[in-house]
């Protein structure tokens, strides 16, 4: 019994902790999924749907404006916090040309930013030699760290500025314009005076897709660090990001959207984007579904079976007590119903002999059979109620009581027939060492009792 109780207790504990675990798992999975939707899942899907070109383009900062007030800040190039309202915004617009490889001499620059297949890194020599005339090795300019290289590019009627790329200036390998004309610009490169801008000749009417009539593929594109234009430190620090890209004339690789060419981002990693999307959906959603399935099964199957087969000890004791009370009540009802068929022993006060008296079904005294010594006088004595079997009422005793009632009823009918013809008494005596006389009397209340 003790082993069964311990086994049952261990099973209940295991069931309790398992249920608690799945409840917590489902709760945290749901909240984690709701948290990841605006910060990871939605930006990842948007990045895929916007179809950004994996081959970087050459971007050049065209305009930088700082606005104040919620009405003026319809968009911002970078903001920390994707859900809060913005009251100060920096808007950066860029011009970009397609295929950065056509404007760089070495592939180590692009390999620093993106990982392309070997086939994508090989370009036909015709495209490269037609663009510019290769410079002699002695014409290259090397910086102190040996990471920079410069070249001159002839573009028909115009001459492109000298481009240096490397990590010496802390630009993380971005193309930097080697120009000393920074007057009228703040530390971040934002124009704060009325002096001429490098691109004043380009009017706003000329913004958009340029086609073949311009050296730029698109003019006035909006620049963002990612597709949502927002983030949180340390992944994205807008202060550092703005210092890097707000300077007018800054050249750097960028990625434009095939769906919306006016949208340009500075960083793109499709592999990491897909990986984040898979993790944010493959972990919370199955965990939540498994938790719901288990809790549903436990509620409709496990706990219902336990309640039917193995109730708690306290409830079991209460049920046992109720069953005992119900049995007592039913036995009392049976005794009350069968009281007409019970037997009463009439004790003789003078001789201490017993007299067996039957009670008719109508509740009155009926046929009485007394057993006494010869010559004794039978007088009424105290009544002792006794069941026909002399024990507690059982199904067998109920059957015996029914038979006794039938016999008493038949004797009552015979007695009534005898009373109609007169008083009939019978007496039988047995002679022997002990002389006993059986006396039978039939009486009906409230009339006198006929005795023989």
UniProtKB/Swiss-Prot annotation:
What does the function comment of this entry state?
Enhances para sodium channel function. Required during pupal development to rescue adult paralysis and also protects adult flies against heat-induced lethality.
Q: Extracellular topology: which positions?
A: 42-274
Q: Which segments carry the region annotation Disordered?
A: 423-452
Positions of glycan attachment? 72, 102, 108, 212, 237
Predominant subcellular localization, coarse grouping: membrane
TM segments? 21-41, 275-295
Alphabetically ordered keywords of this record: Glycoprotein, Membrane, Transmembrane, Transmembrane helix
| Protein's membrane topology | Multi-pass membrane protein
State the name under which the record lists this protein.
Answer: Protein tipE
The molecular function terms in GO held by this entry are: sodium channel regulator activity; voltage-gated sodium channel activity
For this record, an example GO cellular component is: plasma membrane
Composition skew (Polar residues), residue ranges = 423-444
BP-aspect Gene Ontology terms: cellular response to heat; male courtship behavior, veined wing generated song production; regulation of sodium ion transport; sodium ion transport
- Entry's Pfam families? TipE
Positions on the Cytoplasmic side per record topology: 1-20, 296-452
Q: What is the tissue specificity?
A: Preferentially expressed in the central nervous system of developing embryos, weaker expression is seen in the peripheral nervous system. In pupae and adults, expression is seen predominantly in heads, body and legs.
Subcellular location, record wording: Membrane
């Amino acid at each position: 019994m003790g082993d069964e109780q311990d086994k049952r207790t261990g099973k209940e504990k295991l069931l309790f902790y398992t249920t608690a675990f799945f409840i917590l798992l489902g709760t945290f999975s749901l909240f984690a999924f709701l948290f990841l939707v605006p910060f990871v899942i939605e930006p990842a899907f948007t990045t895929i749907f916007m179809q950004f070109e994996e081959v970087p383009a050459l971007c050049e900062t065209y305009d930088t404006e700082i606005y104040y007030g919620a009405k003026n800040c319809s968009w911002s190039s970078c903001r920390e916090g994707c859900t809060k309202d913005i009251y100060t915004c920096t808007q950066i617009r860029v011009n970009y040309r397609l295929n950065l490889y056509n404007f760089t001499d070495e592939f180590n620059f692009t390999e620093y930013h993106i990982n392309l297949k070997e086939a994508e890194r090989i370009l036909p020599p015709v495209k490269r030699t037609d663009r510019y005339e290769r410079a002699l090795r002695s014409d290259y300019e090397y910086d102190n760290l040996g990471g920079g290289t410069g070249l001159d590019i002839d573009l028909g009627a115009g001459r492109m500025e000298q481009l240096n790329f490397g990590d010496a200036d802390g630009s993380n390998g971005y193309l930097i314009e080697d120009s000393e004309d920074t007057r009228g610009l703040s530390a971040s490169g934002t124009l704060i005076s009325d002096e001429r801008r490098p691109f004043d000749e380009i009017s706003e009417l000329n913004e958009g897709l340029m086609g073949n009539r311009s050296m730029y593929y698109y003019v006035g594109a909006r620049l963002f660090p990612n597709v949502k234009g927002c983030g949180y430190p340390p992944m994205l620090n807008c202060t550092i990001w703005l210092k890097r890209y707000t300077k007018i004339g800054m050249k750097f690789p960028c990625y434009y959207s095939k769906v919306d060419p006016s949208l340009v981002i500075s960083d793109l990693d499709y592999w990491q984007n897909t990986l984040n999307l898979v993790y944010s959906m493959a972990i919370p959603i199955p965990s939540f579904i498994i938790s719901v399935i288990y809790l549903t099964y436990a509620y409709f199957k496990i706990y219902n079976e336990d309640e039917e087969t193995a109730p708690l000890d306290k409830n079991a004791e209460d049920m046992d007590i109720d069953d005992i009370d119900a049995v007592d009540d039913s036995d009392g009802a049976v005794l009350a119903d069968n009281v007409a068929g019970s037997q009463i022993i009439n004790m003789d006060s003078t001789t201490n002999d017993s007299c067996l008296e039957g009670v008719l079904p109508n509740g009155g005294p009926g046929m009485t059979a007394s057993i006494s010594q010869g010559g004794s006088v039978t007088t009424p004595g105290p009544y002792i109620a006794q069941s026909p079997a002399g024990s507690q009422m059982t199904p067998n005793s109920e059957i015996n009581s029914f038979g006794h009632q039938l016999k008493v009823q038949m004797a009552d009918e015979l007695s009534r027939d005898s009373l109609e013809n007169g008083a009939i008494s019978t007496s039988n005596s047995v002679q022997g060492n002990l002389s006993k006389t059986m006396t039978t009397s039939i009486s009906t209340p409230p009339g006198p009792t006929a005795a023989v």
